[in-house]
From Swiss-Prot:
BP GO terms, sorted: thiamine diphosphate biosynthetic process
Any Pfam family: ThiG
GO molecular function, one term: thiazole synthase activity
Name of the molecule in the record: Thiazole synthase
Keyword field contains Oxidoreductase: no
Source superkingdom: Bacteria
Gene Ontology CC entries for this record: cytoplasm
InterPro entries in UniProt: Aldolase_TIM (IPR013785), Thiazole_synthase_ThiG (IPR033983), ThiG (IPR008867)
UniProt entry keywords in alphabetical sequence: Cytoplasm, Schiff base, Thiamine biosynthesis, Transferase
Organism name: Bacillus licheniformis (strain ATCC 14580 / DSM 13 / JCM 2505 / CCUG 7422 / NBRC 12200 / NCIMB 9375 / NCTC 10341 / NRRL NRS-1264 / Gibson 46)
Length: 255
């Protein structure tokens, strides 16, 4: 089970809800993923405009936990305002803190992320910050009291997969809160690898919404996350430079 604060989830796959070809495909992909946590950008939702289309209306919200995010924020103050807007609209008090420091790479601003996380913790939010794979920054966020750490595998939407597995493994090793690999996942292989490293979960969006068949890809990601987790728990064999026969020498037939 994935445990975030006082909540437990059977699925370790968190799914983003942006950029799907249609509401219908989005709904089918969400269902196929069997994800229980759905994230979305508050700024791109028509929360207070009932006349405008809203993907939340297409879903059975009793089945999902909503994870609003502060995408579009460039300062801690902006992120806090967006989080409060989400809470005021009756959405979940969990918030994914996302403060972008570079428009080209979409990498997070470490200083503003720390500031926003600290303020939102003081306001009583369940805080899940999107961060880089900086090991020290991850530790500082945990020391603040965040409820999960969400290091990026690579830049948002890049599909490059896990660029720095060593740093991710360091973050996972030191963390006492869930580590959810977020951003840059491009294929089921990437999702499985993140879980094999020991991550507690994977959050992805573009890998599914941008696939030729988002519904099938959502299903593939579900199985990849499950396989990676099982592989991690089972324990892989150590790598060696030379081959080792799988058949024992003892009792070998002499011909």
């Amino acid at each position: 089970m994935l445990k975030i604060a006082d909540r437990q989830f059977s699925s370790r796959l968190l799914l983003g809800t942006g950029k799907y070809p249609s509401f219908e495909i989005q709904k089918e992909a969400v269902s196929a993923s069997e994800s229980e946590i759905l994230t979305f950008a508050v700024r791109r939702m028509n929360i207070f405009e009932e006349s405008q289309p809203n993907f939340l209306e297409q879903l059975d919200l009793s089945r999902y936990t909503l994870l609003p995010n502060t995408a579009g924020a460039k300062t801690a103050e902006e992120a806090v305002r967006i989080a409060k807007l989400a809470k005021a609209s009756g959405l979940c008090d969990m918030i994914k803190v996302e403060v972008i420091g570079c428009d080209r790479s979409l990498l997070p601003d470490p200083v503003e992320t720390l500031k926003a996380s600290e303020t939102l913790l003081e306001e009583g939010f369940i805080v899940l910050p999107y961060t880089s794979d900086d090991v020290v920054l991850a530790r500082k966020l945990e020391e603040l009291g965040v409820h999960a750490i969400m290091p990026g595998a690579s830049p948002i939407g890049s599909g490059q997969g896990i660029i720095n597995p060593l740093n991710l493994s360091f973050i996972i090793e030191q963390a006492k809160v869930p580590v959810i690999v977020d951003a840059g996942i491009g294929s089921p292989k990437d999702a499985a690898y993140a879980m094999e490293l020991g991550a507690d979960g994977v959050l992805l969006n573009t890998a599914v919404s941008g696939a030729k068949d988002p519904v099938q890809m959502a299903k593939a990601m579900k199985f990849a996350v499950e396989a990676g987790r099982l592989g991690y728990l089972a324990g892989r064999i150590p790598e060696k430079n030379y081959g080792i026969a799988s058949s024992p020498e003892e009792g070998k037939l002499t011909i």
